[in-house]
Amino acid sequence: MKHVFPTYNRFPVDIVKGNGTVVKDATGKTYLDFTSGIAVCNLGHCPENVTEAIQSQLANIWHTSNLYECALQDSVAELITDGTDKLVFFCNSGTEANEAALKLARKYTGKEKIITFEKSFHGRTFGSMSATGQAKIHQGFGRLVPGFTYVPYNDIESFKTELDENTAAVMLEVIQGEGGVIPGNAAWLMEVQMLCKKAGALLIIDEVQTGLGRTGTLFGFQQTFLDPDIFTLAKGLGNGLPIGAMVGKEHLSSAFGPGSHGSTFGGNKLALAAAKEILLTMKQTGFLEEVNAKAAYFRNLLEEHFEQLENVVAIRGEGFLIGIELGSSAAPVVTELRDKGLLILTAGPNILRILPPLTVSYAEIDQAISILKSVLEKQLIGSE
């Protein structure tokens, strides 16, 4: 790619077509996509009902800006908040949603200090990059936005040491996806929430990767019955169309009046048409129950076939956000899997990250397990 900045280490594959879990490259080779576009295409590629909703909106109007009323924004916001005391700000991506959350927290509390966690990932714009607890993400960009403090994840004593009356907010992921697929301990998450309330700090949960059914509930924080002051969405909210959302408790709106924040494209009708259909699908009776059944089936097979392998250190995650920690580099495994027709990701040097569409079939799960088995067992033999 001669005319594009080299900001990505791209795989040598050009995906040109997709349907459900299956994608096809420019040479005609097909793959099982167990990346979902990095947890984006939760309903698979080109789901018929979402495609129809987009096509219908395309024929009417795409963009009007936020100068005008938008019934579609209100409709999607209602589906997200589902009768709770929350309001929504629409934007175009996860990093923008997190920027909005950080701005709201500081403006509402009048405080600057924000606690985040080591190995976290919240985005690459300056505010969300500053919130990210990874030095490699910060390198080369000069002075970060001040006021951020990073503490070890799942470590309540370190957290207690940093939390004080000057803390505006605490920002966390219930599963650190980019940081190695590290689930937050349920008791730790609950205690963090309790301590935030006691200190008067807002709790912000970054649901960009864990939201929209990925962990088996509509939002990942519902796994542990948390009640965040603010949470953020993107990725699966548009199933490939650019949309993000910052969701906050209604009383916070006193700090976010006209002129306090904005977005030219945020909440555009085309992305919202997709989001509405996606949310309606996920809220259908039995949808998430089926996701959980398939995820349990997949997890059982992973543990049955791979836990005993010498090179497999751990299998962890929730729902269809799964990490396999290896005793060696993950990159060669990902390459060989791709050659055999299975696309997965890494989450660090030795972590395989597996993110199939929520609509994956049992037969596709079986096929993926077969490919994984052939490659991981071969890697084990090769290391002996």
Curated annotation (Swiss-Prot):
Oligomer status and interactors: Homodimer.
Binding-site residues for N(2)-acetyl-L-ornithine, renumbered to this chain: 124, 263
Official protein name in the record: Acetylornithine aminotransferase
Gene Ontology terms describing biological process: L-arginine biosynthetic process
Gene3D superfamilies found in the cross-reference section: Aspartate Aminotransferase, domain 1, Type I PLP-dependent aspartate aminotransferase-like (Major domain)
Keywords: Amino-acid biosynthesis, Aminotransferase, Arginine biosynthesis, Cytoplasm, Pyridoxal phosphate, Transferase
Binding site for pyridoxal 5'-phosphate: 94-95, 121, 206-209, 264
Source species taxonomy: Bacteria, Bacillati, Bacillota, Bacilli, Bacillales
Source species of the chain: Listeria innocua serovar 6a (strain ATCC BAA-680 / CLIP 11262)
Cofactor: pyridoxal 5'-phosphate
Superkingdom field: Bacteria
Short name of one Pfam family: Aminotran_3
